[in-house]
Amino acid sequence: MKENVAEFLRRTILKIPLSEMKSILEAWDFLSEDQLQTINLKQRKDYLAQEVILLCEDKRASLDDVVLLDIVYTQFHRHQKLWNVFQMSKEPGEDVDLFDMEQFQSSFKRILQRALKNVTVSFRVYEKDSVWIRVAWGTQYSQPNQYKPTFVVYYPQTPYAFISSCHLKNTVPLLHQALKVASKHHQIVHLDLRSRHLDSLKAIVFREYNQTCENYSSTTSLQEASLSMCLDSKITHENTEEKVRVHRVTQETFGTYPQPQLEFAQYKLETKFKSNIGGGLLADRKEPFRCLVKFSSPHLLEALKSLAPAGIADAPLSPLLTCIPSKKMNYFKIRDK
């Protein structure tokens, strides 16, 4: 095994938590069950890494093999990446093609390798419904940097792809071109939707977040919830009817199901100064006023959902706050109509 491959493997092993080491190595599916049994998972991680390297040397592990381990690690820790959502589209009236995984991978890799001399492209099908793509970028004069790859998660037969942040901005258009052509789409656009929680982004774009409420009877549930609210002796209601109304409006707006997990929402406002009183310095200003408001929380939508019931905000909340899942965006630009 080459020295640079061994070092890449060592660093990959070192970043895996000991509690997940066995699961990740098993999911990697490179070492045999007997080899995995010989690994002492209770020793110091640097010794453990050396033990794994020796086992991989016996099997003549290549760079491609170690890259697959890095993909598996990233799948376990996908929340460590900031994911951007992209939506592709076909020409009007264009037929939907049957998806061929081998053809997709070949086309994607060919486009990148024709444009760039030094690039490493790897694939891993995950849970049969998505393909994970890992791209390590190099330059004309340097080998691909395996420590700063870009990840693409594409769901075949859908127009959606999720791409992690790329440190080389000049490669982004090429990546979009490869994805668009390989998946046989005509156009790709960046949705104003980002998060570290890939599963929540997927739930939003595929509208999976409300599946748990399909058998939900709103009238009955609201009555039961309101009754339990009134019977709770620990809560004092100054206005029971208002509390019931707030509870009803909140459930109508957010539903009873868990909200997708997003960490932030950003609103950019651009507006011209308006006044019924003519003249003045501000009225003559040609440049619009600009304002940036950012909401952040470990679980923003659940936090917004709790505002009105907690008495912090009036119900219903502004549509700008509640439309995030339906609009599929958490970056907004608000301008004069």
From Swiss-Prot:
Keywords assigned by UniProt, alphabetized: Centromere, Chromosome, Kinetochore, Nucleus, Phosphoprotein
Family to which the UniProt record says this protein belongs: Belongs to the CENP-N/CHL4 family.
Any single GO BP term: CENP-A containing chromatin assembly
Source organism superkingdom: Eukaryota
Name of the protein in its database record: Centromere protein N
Job description of the protein: Component of the CENPA-NAC (nucleosome-associated) complex, a complex that plays a central role in assembly of kinetochore proteins, mitotic progression and chromosome segregation. The CENPA-NAC complex recruits the CENPA-CAD (nucleosome distal) complex and may be involved in incorporation of newly synthesized CENPA into centromeres. CENPN is the first protein to bind specifically to CENPA nucleosomes and the direct binding of CENPA nucleosomes by CENPN is required for centromere assembly. Required for chromosome congression and efficiently align the chromosomes on a metaphase plate.
InterPro entries: CENP-NAC/CAD_complex, Chl4/mis15/CENP-N
Subunit structure: Component of the CENPA-NAC complex, at least composed of CENPA, CENPC, CENPH, CENPM, CENPN, CENPT and CENPU. The CENPA-NAC complex interacts with the CENPA-CAD complex, composed of CENPI, CENPK, CENPL, CENPO, CENPP, CENPQ, CENPR and CENPS. Interacts directly with CENPA. Identified in a centromere complex containing histones H2A, H2B and H4, and at least CENPA, CENPB, CENPC, CENPT, CENPN, HJURP, SUPT16H, SSRP1 and RSF1.
GO annotation, cellular component aspect: inner kinetochore; nucleoplasm; nucleus
Pfam families in UniProt: CENP-N
Record localization: Nucleus; Chromosome, Centromere; Chromosome, Centromere, Kinetochore
Phosphoserine modification, residue list: 226, 233
